[in-house]
Amino acid sequence: MSKDDVIQMQGEILENLPNATFRVKLENGHVVLGHISGKMRMHYIRILPGDKVTVELTPYDLSRARIVFRAK
């Protein structure tokens, strides 16, 4: 799958779950499970409930997402 196939959306963290997984509410109202991307994990970027994030969804599974950016 190429990078052109991903769907980028904005969302807000609702709650922390185990294993660096988060429940994210997207701007269209859907709630998905999101995990931190490798670069964010490598640079120890902390994510807390209430943070605004950018997530990437694949067209194959719209219930899971990858968190790629945390807004300041």
Swiss-Prot record:
It comes from the Bacteria. It holds the Pfam family eIF-1a. GO terms for cellular component: cytosol. It is found in: Cytoplasm. Its main location: cytoplasm. Residues 1-72 form the S1-like domain. Keywords: Cytoplasm, Initiation factor, Protein biosynthesis, RNA-binding, rRNA-binding. GO terms for molecular function: ribosome binding; rRNA binding; translation initiation factor activity. The keyword Transferase does not apply. Belongs to the IF-1 family. One of the essential components for the initiation of protein synthesis. Stabilizes the binding of IF-2 and IF-3 on the 30S subunit to which N-formylmethionyl-tRNA(fMet) subsequently binds. Helps modulate mRNA selection, yielding the 30S pre-initiation complex (PIC). Upon addition of the 50S ribosomal subunit IF-1, IF-2 and IF-3 are released leaving the mature 70S translation initiation complex. Component of the 30S ribosomal translation pre-initiation complex which assembles on the 30S ribosome in the order IF-2 and IF-3, IF-1 and N-formylmethionyl-tRNA(fMet); mRNA recruitment can occur at any time during PIC assembly. PANTHER family: TRANSLATION INITIATION FACTOR IF-1, CHLOROPLASTIC. This is Translation initiation factor IF-1. It comes from Methylibium petroleiphilum (strain ATCC BAA-1232 / LMG 22953 / PM1). The gene is infA.
